[in-house]
Amino acid sequence: MTDPHTTTLPTQFDPTGIEPKWAARWRSEPFRADATSGKDPFTIVIPPPNVTGNLHLGHALDNTLIDTLIRYKRMAGFEALYLPGMDHAGISTQVVVERQLKDAGTSRHDLGREAFLEKVWEWKGKSGGMILDQLTRLGVSADWTRERFTMDEGLSRAVRTQFVKLYHDGLAYRGERIVNWDPASQTTLSELEIDREVRKGKMYTLSYKLENSAERGSNGETGEIRIATVRPETIFADQAIAVHPEDERFRHLVGQKARIPLTDRWVPIIADEAVEMEFGVGALKITPAHDPTDFEVGERHGLERPSVIDLDGNLTRDELVPAEFQGLERFAARKAVVKALEESGDLLEQKDHDTAIGLSERTKVPVEPIISEQWFVKMKPFADQVLEGLDKGEIKLVPERYTKVNRDWLENIRDWNISRQLWWGHQIPAWYDKEGNIYVPDPENPELDCDQDPRYAHLNLRRDPDVFDTWFSSNLWPFSTLGWPDTDSEDFRKFYPTQVLVTGYDILFFWVARMQMAGYGLTGQAPFSTVMLHGLYLDAKGQKMSKSKGNGIDPLELFGQYGVDACRFAFTFLSTGGQDIKHDARRFEQGRNFANKLWNATRFALMRLGEARIEGSDDLSAYVRAAVTLPDGVLLRSKDVLAQLKERDDLTLADRWIISRLNDVTAEASAQLDAFDIGAAIRTLYSFTWDEFCDWYIEAAKPELASGNLGTMATLKVVLEHVLKLLHPFMPFITSELYAALGHRRQIAVHSWPQPDAALHDAEATKAFDALRSAVDSARSLKSELGLSPQDRLNVAVDGDLADVVRQNARVVEGIARVNLVPALEGRTLSQVAPGVTILAPLEGTVDIADWVKKQQKRLAELDKQIKQAQGKLNNEGFVARAPAEVIEEEKRRVADFGAQKERLEGVLAQLG
């Protein structure tokens, strides 16, 4: 790591030379938040990654955005807490350990529950948590002393307290409902543990014979009603035929009965608005045990709900199922049933049909909707509390459009299945006696197991073997990590409720909404005031990354290729308004180039300040302290330094301009960060640093620095330090290194964020320096049009309202544009007009005018051709319909650019006659 007293930097920037040292320092000397401080809190809890996980681009994006906000708020004077931790990831972890046991020739059932759980904890100790080490490499400024795990003792107590309260409040209950069942892992699954995939399948149209054979069906056929289904193997569990009450085709059949094919069972024809009249043939078979919608229809109509598919995914050995199909695997049964339907004449049609199916994320086995007795939580009371909070503005979603999405889900909330048939997780604290009565610990003593309670000693209770859904613990994350249910703990009182949650929109329902409901339900408050949602990180073609597609990108490889700061730059630069993010290697290259630019600018400053720079100050170097005439011993805020710097009488126009622009950009970037528009903030700072500070100010300052102008030296150092502070939340490694190289013992992360001051805005200097920039741009453009290289010198003259400003600062224009500013020019000239400034260049003596005109006419013809080609694409409806939006925008830009060049050339040629 650079010694704070060094005066030089290596010629080349090498991220690998600085990143490991700073990362190690931030892990060993964490940014500990003080629960007793008088500062306003700013808390963000990490979306806890799975203990089984490795860092992927979603994690890298999440935590870069979080760390950017945390570092900004810490510098802005808040007591900032970035709370890290991991989720126990019930099914994922159990699958990993079971796979290891299988490789060793055993199983969890061979070991038994206690021994298996010991194996899981052993695995967690050795292999779990690798992702947190990878987050350290990302440079997150987390408070590692507060690291949490959802199976920690304190968090386990919170989970237990939650369930006990819900049960005794009548909100947690045991009942039969449709659940997502994984036949391979033998457990229910949450929606987030299911991958949705569209596969080629078949739609089967079946004939259900009507009880009154004289009646006509929907298509005028006599004695039958036609049903379309993608799952003919479930017909044996049918309990009704449903039609829409307003469907004229079927209204006359409501109340009659129809026979299930291949059976002698008759079911009623009912009317229900759940039926989509346009789907299939407009009539729906109702199988309450094997479809969520059918289950709800069955509830409304009091239908029975027998199941014909067992927990292994086979047809049951039940009298409802004809003997020849009993015990068949469900997909084999489908083929057998279709064949039998063909033979019986009840299969009227089968056609190709794209079917959306759910696959278990871990086992890749198709999920089976089945009825199962599970634990559920009534969610509507909690959803109503969140909706009221949204109405009051207690929770803000960024971007705002997600508020409606959030609200729609809450308004249509369903009860939550919280039990899982696993061993790894929080075992449900419920016990049963031999009659099946349920016993749950007393709310006054939730830690006391019922089988240890003296009141129940005579009952020989057995504990529920199931565990809670992983989300049942992670929904407590914003407050269980801060000590809840101990609401008097220092951390809970200081840091709860948290300020911001940063996460992807894809878990808005599974996690974010549930945290909102848990927060209101258990603490009486919203768990966070702002939810900042970002999009999914996609590959360069806009597709989701997955192992099966082979399109995944390892962020650790990106770190090695570009450097972590460059990657953080890219992640933030690409983040725009909650939109999905396409991987763009150019942004990572841009980040690497930007880091190099910053490194070289600091090297230049160190070399130019030279012997005038005196080491030793903790906040500002003694040199700058003297240069801006600050009294010894007084540490001033950034804006005070700039204000006193501005009052010096040896500042140049460029010095005054960059001070004003720095102040304006500080205000702009701060406002963008406060609005959680992190992408806009880094784009603002990038443009200012590269274009204005490095390319314009430093170039303009070179003559003054060479002549020893103390005002310019002070301006260069103070502005550079401000730039490093502004960029620090985004690119912490390089800014920390460079700030230390400028003579600071305290790391930049604990310095104050620059404060804008309206008095520092200098409209006069801005207008004047803009005139210089226009003069330079015009001179460069003229040299290019005349066929000169950037290094060739050219005599130019200036005219216009701001010509005197340009003449007074001739050294700047001449040095940057490599021209000689002369009072006037003889003969024919070529001019470039900008607001307030016209630059003229001589034609005679510079070019062969006739030859030059001929070249411009040829160029004009080329431009006409290019405009027609680009415009032709835009006029092609097929191209516009197929091409990505960015390609279309590029063609529009080409038309505009070529048009502007053409207009310029036509004007020049007309001027020459």
From Swiss-Prot:
Matches recorded under PROSITE patterns: AA_TRNA_LIGASE_I (PS00178)
UniProt keyword annotation of Coiled coil present: yes
GO MF entries: aminoacyl-tRNA deacylase activity; ATP binding; valine-tRNA ligase activity
SUPFAM superfamilies: Anticodon-binding domain of a subclass of class I aminoacyl-tRNA synthetases (SSF47323), Nucleotidylyl transferase (SSF52374), tRNA-binding arm (SSF46589), ValRS/IleRS/LeuRS editing domain (SSF50677)
Gene Ontology cellular-component annotations: cytosol
Catalyses which reaction(s): tRNA(Val) + L-valine + ATP = L-valyl-tRNA(Val) + AMP + diphosphate
Location of the motif 'KMSKS' region: 544-548
Pfam families per UniProt: Anticodon_1, tRNA-synt_1, Val_tRNA-synt_C
Keywords from the UniProt entry: Aminoacyl-tRNA synthetase, ATP-binding, Coiled coil, Cytoplasm, Ligase, Nucleotide-binding, Protein biosynthesis
Assembly behavior: Monomer.
Entry text on domains: ValRS has two distinct active sites: one for aminoacylation and one for editing. The misactivated threonine is translocated from the active site to the editing site.
Official protein name in the record: Valine--tRNA ligase
Organism expressing this protein natively: Deinococcus radiodurans (strain ATCC 13939 / DSM 20539 / JCM 16871 / CCUG 27074 / LMG 4051 / NBRC 15346 / NCIMB 9279 / VKM B-1422 / R1)
